[in-house]
Amino acid sequence: MKNIFITTLLFLTVVFCSAQEKYVPSQENLTNREWFRDAKFGMFIHWGIYSMLADGEWVLTNKSLNEAEYQKLADGFYPSKFNADEWVRIAKDAGMKYICFTSRHHDGFSMFDTKQSDYNIVKATPFKRDVIKELAEACQKRGLKLFFYYSHIDWHRPDYYPWGRTGRNTGRTPSGT
């Protein structure tokens, strides 16, 4: 009898505790989706210190680079020809409706000034400019929407635990520390 009671209790707990409410999007969410569908044309910019290696944002893992050595790229990151106004003008003149910018990818390097980490374009590079701020100001001035891609995966953090193939073979221990 005791086993039946415990089994029934566990069953009911699992059934009722794991039930999720059906997602109902807000009107704002639906309106934003419709806007995005209708926009049809925009620019997605993947740009960060990985660009210095003439490779994509996964270069750290794909090429099994040492994470500590990869961090040193920030010391030489100086995009002297960056011009937010020019980028936005080109996008607008081409008929684009938005720009989506990679504010931070898995390498943990932020393309904006943040108090959460010194590993960012303002504090860790000789460039010392907040390109996100400049891009936001240029987009606002020309009436172009701006969206951000921000990765929660962060190979730079010592407490990051590598899931799947991300962050492996980069000089870190299996626990991510």
Language model regions located:
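Bacterial Sec-dependent N-terminal signal peptides
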Residues: 1-21
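Mature catalytic domains of secreted/periplasmic carbohydrate-active enzymes
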Residues: 20-177
